């Protein structure tokens, strides 16, 4: 599976995808690509330097961890939608949620959901 770049676990960072390496992961995960995590907003579950495996899908269930593009930046957060509002919630309580309302929703694209985490590769 291709390791295609990095994703922020904190403040969203510029989204760039280039195949940096290939990694082996369990076929059961049905992952399409992997990203290296930077930051600690998703600690204790996902640590700085972990590799997350992502299954491409345009929608996720409330509470699932998603790779989300916000304009030209990307971040990894728990995704919640309620009506015309989307909230991206960190695992680390030191980080405030990112909230987007009706006028901002066209800036948000779900790239996929986390289906596996690799540590120490």
What annotation goes with each model-predicted range?
Residues 1-48, 74, 81, 116-121:
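Short, positionally conserved secondary-structure boundary motifs
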Residues 70-74, 108-109:
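Short coil-to-beta-strand transition motifs
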Residues 74-76, 97:
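Short, mixed charged/polar active-site loops
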Residues 82-121:
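Glycine- and charge-enriched low-complexity intrinsically disordered segments
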């Amino acid at each position: 599976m291709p390791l295609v770049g990095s994703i922020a676990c904190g403040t969203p960072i510029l989204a760039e995808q280039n195949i940096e390496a290939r990694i082996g992961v369990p076929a059961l995960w049905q992952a399409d690509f992997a990203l290296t995590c930077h930051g600690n907003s998703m600690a204790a579950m996902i640590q700085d330097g972990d590799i997350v495996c992502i299954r491409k899908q345009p929608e996720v269930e409330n509470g699932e961890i998603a790779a989300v593009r916000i304009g030209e930046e990307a971040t990894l957060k728990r995704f919640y939608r309620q009506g015309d509002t989307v909230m991206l919630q960190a695992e680390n309580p030191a980080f405030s949620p990112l909230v987007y309302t009706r006028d901002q929703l066209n800036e948000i694209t779900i790239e996929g959901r986390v289906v596996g985490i690799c540590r120490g590769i």
